[in-house]
Amino acid sequence: MQTSAIPNLSNSTLPKLPSGVKIPNYNRSNLTAGIVHIGLGNFHRAHQSWYLHRLMQQGKAHDWAIIGAGVKEFDKAQRLKLLAQDFLTTLVELSPVGRTVEVVGSMIDYVPIEANNGPLIAQMAKPEIKIVTLTVTEGGYYIDPVSKSFDSSHPDIVYDATHPEAPKTAFGAMVAALRLRRDSGVGP
């Protein structure tokens, strides 16, 4: 028995997916950004991204699309993978009665990753961005393991404090974006 190959995921291949796969019922080209999300791991894609997708399926929240972002070198590979599939992701839900497969279309872009986080700062400073969210691993919070408090002496945090125009961390990039928003008269 020969099975047909499933095409690579992209806007143009959505109609070619197997009939049991749920696909966006909205025109993704009409979506506009409202959220920048830093840290596009599985948790984000199966929760926040899916939640917005479900609203978009109902004809709502089309001005709340997500622009993905990262601040680490390894985020570059993820950006390229998502770019190749038009920022579409797939959510597979398993239950005792079976599984569902749904293509999630709420992400429309992914900020290029640069050492100084300039593109991320510029994107977060845009007036149409209403929310910046993030999901990071435990190490990304810069908590001192002994004191359980924020580690202001961590080298990345010290760097951000002394180089506010070119921060290394997500937190430093958010501070820089807030400064840009303030200086240009855009609300926080």
Predicted features by range, described:
Residues 1-188:
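Non-transmembrane, aqueous-exposed alpha-helical and coiled segments at domain scale
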